[in-house]
Amino acid sequence: MKGSMKELNLGRGVETMYRTTYRTHVNLSSIADNKANIMLSINAIIISIVVANLVPKIPGDYRLAVPTLILLAVCLIALVYAILSTRPKVTQGRATREDIAQKRTNLLFFGNFYRMDLADFHWGMMEMIKDSDFLYSSMTRDLYYLGVVLAKKYQYLRICYNVFMYGLIVAVAAFAAAFLFWPAPV
C-alpha cells in the first residue's frame, strides 16, 4: 500500500507529536470548562441577587422594571451558552466487529465503545494494535474530533462572554437612563 503508515518511519517524533497534541487538546478543553464554570457562577450569583433584591422593589419603583428585566435576560442567555459549552455529546456507544474490521470506527473515543462487550472491545483494540495504519488513522481521527468539539466549546464561550459583556453595558445604561430621565415615583 503506497503512502501507508507502515512505509513511514514512525519514531519518537510522531509519538511525541500525538502525545503533545492530545495534551494540548485536553488542556484547552479544561480551560474552556473552567471559563464556563466561572460564567455559570457569576451569572447564577447575579440572577440570585437581582431576584432577591431588585425584583421585590419593582412594584414601589417602576423605573427598575425594564433594566432589571434586561439584566435578568442577559444573565440567563449567558448562562445558557455557558451550559451549552460544557454539555457533553455522547454517541451511540456501540461499534460492531464489522465496523472494526472495516476500520469505520474509532475505539480511542469512549463514546464509540462504552456499550460494547469487553471481549469485542478487547478484540478491536488488538486489531488496532496489530495494524499501524488503523491505529494512527484512529488517533488522527480522534484528534480531529477533539478539535471539532473544542471549536464548538470556544464558540459557545465566545457568545457567552459577548452576551455578558455587551448585555451588562446595556443593563447599566438602562439603569442609568431610568434614574436620570424618569421621575421617581411619589
What are these regions (language model features)?
Residues 10-29, 147-149:
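Cytosolic juxtamembrane N-terminal segments of multi-pass membrane proteins
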Residues 87, 106, 110, 138-148, ...:
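Short, highly charged low-complexity linear segments
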Residues 133-159:
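Hydrophobic alpha-helical transmembrane segments and immediately flanking/interface helices
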Residues 50, 121-125, 139:
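Generic structural signal of hydrophobic/aromatic residues within well-ordered alpha-helices
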Residues 69-125:
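Inner-leaflet juxtamembrane helices
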Residues 1-20, 126-142:
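Short, charged cytosolic
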Residues 23, 27-93, 157-186:
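Alpha-helical transmembrane segments and their immediate juxtamembrane boundary regions
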